[in-house]
């Protein structure tokens, strides 16, 4: 079964072709970072318009790269939500039109499920069950994953997500957009321990997160340093990253202990952070925990994860395949709502 995946939930247009027999055949991505940089964040209307311009050329690109035609497509998976409504509608509209024209079934994919399953695209995918640390954009969650469509929320952020804290800290430090990679790069030059920042909810006794207080602590420090030199900024960035990593790593290990699982999967944009990977690898080795990550190319939003997640859902529940071409979008969508009947 050849599945076309379409991702357009925010500021990346991603398309991919995944074959359930041969694996990932082709994927293409256009990032809008340069377009939004002048605004310091994503402008929804501009994002939607750019998706319109990019999606069909990217479709032709992945077909050419895979040596396939539109008529070879057996099913279409698209990001139904969550995300920016206008951006999601672009992908949904193209998916509906293609599905109708080709008379192939469609399946709407939860964006976070795409991230959750992206490490399964690696050469050595993790077997079920496992604990997943999902740190993508506006989401920070710990999930117990027992199979496709069988997910249990263990803990989540009560306010800012880790990615949002990175972006806001970048602005406080006068860094560019996107903030996460900029903060991480600057932190490489920082001196450990130069600033003392809190580790919110580190000892809360549950698996929830909170990063709003950490952001406020960074703001307080920047105000104290009216004439911040480059080394001070690097030191503060290092203190911030260390605090985030400490909390994410500790909560992940607590989730593994609570569930009894020995495998941890890390997914989402923050999952590309080098310091976080090194800490989790170190702690995993000490505790005999296997830690898995997606390829760096698939940490950010992409079409490959949507094609793969759609293919896995169609294999697990063929009844999801719909020849109805009026699919809408779900900008706000709880991951618990996509539980498959077989997982009940």
Curated annotation (Swiss-Prot):
Which HAMAP family has this protein been placed in?
Answer: TsaD
Q: What does the cofactor section's free text say about binding?
A: Binds 1 Fe(2+) ion per subunit.
Role of this protein? Required for the formation of a threonylcarbamoyl group on adenosine at position 37 (t(6)A37) in tRNAs that read codons beginning with adenine. Is involved in the transfer of the threonylcarbamoyl moiety of threonylcarbamoyl-AMP (TC-AMP) to the N6 group of A37, together with TsaE and TsaB. TsaD likely plays a direct catalytic role in this reaction.
Q: Which cofactor does it need?
A: Fe(2+)
One molecular function GO term is: iron ion binding
Task: From the record, give the transmembrane residue ranges.
Answer: none
CDD domains membership: ASKHA_NBD_TsaD_bac
Classification of source organism: Bacteria, Pseudomonadati, Pseudomonadota, Betaproteobacteria, Burkholderiales
Q: Alphabetically, which GO biological process terms does the record hold?
A: tRNA threonylcarbamoyladenosine modification
Q: EC number(s) in its UniProt entry? A: 2.3.1.234
Q: Which reaction does it catalyse?
A: L-threonylcarbamoyladenylate + adenosine(37) in tRNA = N(6)-L-threonylcarbamoyladenosine(37) in tRNA + AMP + H(+)
Pfam families referenced in this protein's UniProt entry, alphabetically: TsaD
Q: What protein name is recorded for this chain?
A: tRNA N6-adenosine threonylcarbamoyltransferase
Q: Which family does it belong to?
A: Belongs to the KAE1 / TsaD family.
């Amino acid at each position: 079964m050849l599945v076309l995946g379409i991702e357009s939930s925010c500021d990346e247009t991603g398309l991919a072709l995944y074959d359930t027999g041969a694996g990932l055949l082709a994927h293409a991505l256009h990032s809008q970072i340069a377009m939004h940089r002048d605004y310091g964040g994503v402008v929804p209307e501009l994002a939607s318009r750019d998706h319109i311009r990019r999606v069909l050329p990217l479709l032709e690109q992945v077909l050419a790269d895979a040596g396939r035609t539109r008529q070879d497509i057996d099913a279409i998976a698209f990001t139904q939500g969550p995300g920016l409504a206008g951006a999601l509608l672009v992908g949904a509209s193209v998916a509906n039109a293609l599905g109708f024209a080709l008379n192939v079934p469609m399946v709407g994919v939860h964006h976070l499920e795409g991230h959750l399953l992206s490490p399964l695209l690696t050469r050595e995918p993790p077997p079920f069950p496992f604990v997943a640390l999902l740190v993508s954009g506006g989401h920070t969650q710990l999930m117990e994953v027992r199979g496709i469509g069988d997910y249990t929320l263990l803990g989540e952020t009560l306010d800012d997500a880790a990615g949002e804290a990175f972006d806001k800290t970048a602005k406080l430090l006068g860094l560019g957009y996107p903030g996460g990679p900029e903060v991480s790069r600057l932190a490489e030059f920082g001196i450990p321990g130069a600033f003392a920042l809190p580790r919110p909810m580190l000892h809360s006794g549950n698996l929830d997160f909170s990063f709003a207080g950490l952001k406020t602590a960074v703001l307080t420090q920047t105000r104290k340093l009216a004439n911040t030199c480059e080394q001070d900024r690097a030191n503060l960035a290092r203190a911030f990253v260390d605090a985030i990593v400490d909390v994410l790593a500790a909560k992940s290990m607590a989730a593994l202990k609570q569930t009894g699982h020995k495998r941890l999967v890390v997914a989402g944009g923050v999952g590309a952070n080098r310091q976080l990977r090194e800490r989790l690898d170190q702690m995993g080795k000490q505790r005999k925990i296997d830690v898995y990550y997606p390829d760096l190319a698939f940490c950010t939003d992409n079409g490959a994860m949507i094609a793969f997640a759609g293919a896995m859902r169609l294999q697990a529940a063929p009844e999801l395949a719909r020849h109805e071409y009026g699919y809408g979008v779900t900008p706000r969508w709880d991951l618990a709502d996509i539980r498959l009947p077989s997982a009940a």
